[in-house]
Amino acid sequence: MPGADKEVDLTERIEAFLSDLKRGGSGTGPLRGSSETARETTALLRRITAQARWSSAGDLMEIIRKEGRRLIAAQPSETTVGNMIRRVLKIIREEYARSRGSSEEADQQESLHKLLTSGGLSEENFRQHFAALRANVIEAINELLTELEGTTDNIAMQALEHIHSNEVIMTVGRSRTVEAFLKDAARKRKFHVIVAECAPFCQGHKMATSLSTAGIETTVIADAAIFAVMSRVNKVIIGTQTVLANGGLRAVNGTHTLALAAKHHSTPLIVCAPMFKLSPQFPNEEDTFHKFVSPHEVLPFTEGEILSKVNVHCPVFDYVPPELITLFISNIGGHAPSYIYRLMSELYHPEDHEL
């Protein structure tokens, strides 16, 4: 039976992706390509839409929520997975509304009176069957995948608006988006990049090697020297793992130190973050916010005498509050941290914030 074969194939692909997520999370450093994770998640959701058994938008949303909860549980710190699931749920809502001939925008911008008097959009609204819905949803997911393919390039294209000749730029660790951003600017501008090494993972060394290979004047500094060097810096440009609902960041360890130093010296702090990193999560959600790894890089196991007397924690991420950030550069342009809530409402439906 071809239907049964499809279901077995789909289950195998979901399980393979789950094990990939788990393995990625147990790595030594925080650098797992978020853009690859976003594309893989979206491609898997497209396959679920195409191959799973469902007859209405409500059924499909229930399947995607169920599988989504499993994917998020496999690696809670990888917020990109949850973000793409919410984007696809929004797509399904929009395509269903289009099939019915109504506008999803009207539903989202309901007045306060309507929200209080009605129970909101119930799942009953998604039970109507439309023959073309599957094809329409798949087409919309394909458009999302195309958008994801070009996110880094779209951010890099804006580099010349922000980086000027003979500037001193500081960054921390290694972000592929920031790397592409700086390399794009280097085609027409001469500038100097200072990279904080980002111990204990020391991804900054890889970043510096990559930039110097591209002909950019680069200096690596220890994390402890950030404040001392900041007075000479014109701009700080960083990447992030997640942009939170309040406009804050969950970024690689050491970013908060950098942001505080930049604030003290009134140095602009620019964050390069594609739209798929926007998450409806808040910094008080402790269980998914923090991620700790083995501290053997900080305190080797050979230090036997000290090891028995201390507890060592090695967090992967820092929280950076929105008041320390000057500007976000996403694949659709530049935004102030206070504008994040608006982007969030455009990307995700309020009912999908909790899967």
Swiss-Prot record:
Main location: cytoplasm
GO molecular function, one term: GTP binding
A single BP term in Gene Ontology: central nervous system development
SUPFAM superfamilies: NagB/RpiA/CoA transferase-like
One GO cellular component term noted in the UniProt record for this chain: eukaryotic translation initiation factor 2B complex
Keywords: Cytoplasm, Initiation factor, Protein biosynthesis
Family: Belongs to the eIF-2B alpha/beta/delta subunits family.
Function summary: Acts as a component of the translation initiation factor 2B (eIF2B) complex, which catalyzes the exchange of GDP for GTP on eukaryotic initiation factor 2 (eIF2) gamma subunit. Its guanine nucleotide exchange factor activity is repressed when bound to eIF2 complex phosphorylated on the alpha subunit, thereby limiting the amount of methionyl-initiator methionine tRNA available to the ribosome and consequently global translation is repressed.
Subunit structure: Component of the translation initiation factor 2B (eIF2B) complex which is a heterodecamer of two sets of five different subunits: alpha, beta, gamma, delta and epsilon. Subunits alpha, beta and delta comprise a regulatory subcomplex and subunits epsilon and gamma comprise a catalytic subcomplex. Within the complex, the hexameric regulatory complex resides at the center, with the two heterodimeric catalytic subcomplexes bound on opposite sides.
Protein name in the entry: Translation initiation factor eIF2B subunit beta
Gene: eif2b2
